[in-house]
């Protein structure tokens, strides 16, 4: 539940640094970061409260249990789709001044590629097998690949803000 808050802080910092000529992209990125946070926090809160602590009947479990690929799972994918769209716009708003910033901008824009999959795949019924407990390891593999992609974004953002702070404190 900490990732959405941390991501909003990163998006807000990059929004603050964006130039006037790129504020529309930065604004879109920041608003979409908020949409992402709301969706994902609702999903995680439901999972850690209702799903974990209550005995759910089969119908409720199909809707609320993330592992069964129902409504809550689809909301989670929608949330991460909004994050992908947010990173795309935040990346467009950046004016890189060094290699670290160039890589951060590239990764943020490339991360936007995840949006169509997160948005449209649930509409295809691709995850309906999960409802019957027939899911394989595809979701776990996808999550691990996403983590391998997004960890460098966090590291580069940390370096970006650390360098920004050092340059302004002179």
Task: Give the residues covered by each predicted segment.
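Hydrophobic, aromatic-enriched alpha-helical segments typical of multi-pass transmembrane helices
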Residues: 1-170
């Amino acid at each position: 539940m900490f990732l959405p808050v941390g991501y909003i802080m990163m998006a807000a910092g990059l929004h603050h640094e964006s130039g006037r000529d790129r504020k529309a992209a930065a604004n879109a990125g920041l608003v979409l970061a908020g949409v992402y946070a709301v969706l994902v926090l609702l999903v995680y809160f439901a999972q850690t409260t209702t799903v974990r602590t209550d005995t759910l009947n089969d119908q409720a479990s199909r809707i609320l249990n993330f592992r069964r690929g129902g409504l809550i799972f689809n909301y989670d994918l929608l949330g991460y789709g909004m994050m992908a769209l947010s990173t795309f716009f935040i990346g467009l708003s950046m004016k890189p001044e060094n290699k670290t910033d160039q890589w951060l901008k590239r990764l943020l824009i490339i991360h936007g590629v995840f949006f169509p999959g997160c948005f449209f795949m649930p509409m295809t019924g691709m995850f309906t097998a999960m409802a019957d407990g027939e899911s394989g390891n595809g979701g776990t593999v996808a999550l691990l690949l996403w983590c391998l992609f997004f960890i460098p974004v966090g590291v580069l953002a940390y370096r970006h803000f650390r360098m920004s702070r050092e340059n302004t404190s002179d």
